[in-house]
Regions:
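Alpha-helical transmembrane segments of multi-pass small-molecule/ion transporters
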Residues: 1-281
Length: 281
């Protein structure tokens, strides 16, 4: 897992820099204008998603590393991908960006809490050298700091950055591919065995969570565009961040595998979900 451990933080920092380049202060202040829509998405992603993931892990009686890996991907925020697919689905892109931005920044606290708490529940021992504070500080260096730097750069050269945002999104997409290609290459002898163990769990989590988030949003938020956005935000996670956290805490590739499986499945289910919504509308 040596290659993945080395490239994951670099790629994640660059991806978060790209996210920051696409953000402005209005993406944070916007939530004050539509607090209900934001809160429903925020609560669904930050609270309900990890609870559903824990339920899936316990019901399927997953091996401990796979179960904790599932919790890591469930704790991860949405990424640029969720913003892109929300646009493709004619969802509320502004709300999607706000959710991604806020949940990403909060993730330096929420992710360590979810992972360490769930590991304790699932009977997984974490090294005494690993603390919630230590994880949060390391995450801040590769998540929060790059986002802030990106926002500062955008503020200094907004017109130029705005004209290049599509290129920036494509670059971040390739960085995502590089990380997961490294996982497959480095663990090519074992990857299919791991995927066989994790595949059903991540498929169930992804489908159940998108459907549940959509139903919750349908009950509480203002319109169909917001409902699509919240469902996709809860179904499309920042896989690179999840890989970074998994390699930061654990030495076993098994903890990373649910992330790799989820990254494959979420695109397929995401597009199927969008297709169904378009047909129904």
């Amino acid at each position: 897992m040596e290659i993945v451990t080395k490239i994951a933080p670099i790629c994640l920092a660059l991806i978060m820099l790209g996210l920051g380049l696409g953000l402005s202060v209005k993406d944070f202040t916007r939530i004050l204008r539509v607090p209900k829509d934001f809160f429903v998405g925020f609560f669904s992603q930050l609270v309900i998603l990890p609870i559903v993931a824990l339920g899936v892990a316990l019901i399927l009686n997953l091996p401990a590393p796979i179960a904790v890996g599932l919790m890591i991907i469930a704790a991860a925020p949405g990424g640029v991908t969720s913003n892109v697919l929300t646009k493709f689905a004619n969802g509320d892109v502004a709300l999607s960006i706000s959710l991604t931005a806020v949940v990403s920044l909060i993730s330096i606290v929420s992710v360590p809490f979810v992972v360490i708490t769930s590991a304790d529940i699932l009977g997984v021992t974490i090294s005494s050298d690993i603390s919630m504070t230590g994880i949060a500080l390391k995450m801040a260096l590769v998540v929060t700091v790059p986002v802030i730097i990106g926002m500062i750069i955008r503020g200094l050269a907004e017109n130029f950055i705005s004209s290049k945002i599509n290129i920036i999104n494509k670059i971040t997409g390739w960085l995502f591919i590089i990380v997961f290609a490294a996982i497959w290459i480095e663990e090519k002898d074992n990857i299919f065995n791991y995927l066989a163990e994790a595949g059903l769990a991540v498929l169930i989590l992804n489908i159940v969570m998108m459907m549940l988030a959509y139903l919750i949003a349908k009950k509480f938020v203002s319109g169909i565009a917001q409902q699509k956005c919240i469902a996709l935000e809860c179904g499309l996670q920042n896989g690179t961040l999840a890989v970074f956290v998994a390699t930061l805490i654990f030495d076993d590739i098994a903890y990373v595998v649910p992330t790799a499986a989820y990254a494959l499945i979420m695109y397929i289910t995401g597009f199927i979900f969008i297709y169904i919504l378009r047909k129904s509308n």
